[in-house]
Amino acid sequence: MLAMNVLFITADQWRGDSLSCVGHPAVRTPVLDRLAADGVLFTRHYAQATPCGPSRASLHTGLYALNHRSITNGTPLDSRHRTLASVVREAGYDPVLFGYTDTSADPRRLPPDSPWLRTYEGVAPGFRTELRVTEAEEVYLAHLAERGYGRLDYADVYGGGFLRPA
């Protein structure tokens, strides 16, 4: 039996109501709308922790922050914790990352002169990195500008009475 492909999308600081498929009046997300129509759209997802780094660590490990202990941005993720990417790799998948996870490497597993000790912008274990955000941001923004898409003003996205309770 052929294994199914899985597309798992996470976004940093992206409000759940900022998709056109859920009725946002200014944001247009046609590709994501099609994916949501053919897949699974979690309309009541809540982050386990704040800020973003600990929240991602919880998402990637399935653990509460008090268990994985990565409680601030830049706190390394203990290498004893298995990540979703590692588990699916063991199952025969090839988890590929486009973007970032901002997961600090466990310093106990690195040599003292490792460049990964100077940043918390690492990649969670198990992923094969295809394209990092830092490599693609300007190219992507230029691609959008060529097609007439600019950056929305904060008030366009969050104003206008669109905010509503969950």
Show which residues each predicted segment covers.
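Short, solvent-exposed turn/loop segments enriched in Gly/Ser/Thr/Pro and often Arg
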Residues: 11, 21-23, 39-61, 76-77, ...
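A conserved catalytic-core signature of glycosyltransferases
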Residues: 30, 54-55, 72, 79
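Catalytic-site neighborhoods of secreted/periplasmic enzymes
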Residues: 61-166
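Glycine-rich, flexible loop/turn motifs
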Residues: 15-18, 23, 42, 55-56, ...
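Proline-centered helix-kink/hinge sites
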Residues: 4, 29-31, 50, 54, ...
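Active-site-proximal N-terminal segment of extracellular/periplasmic enzymes that hydrolyze or transfer
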Residues: 1-49, 89-90
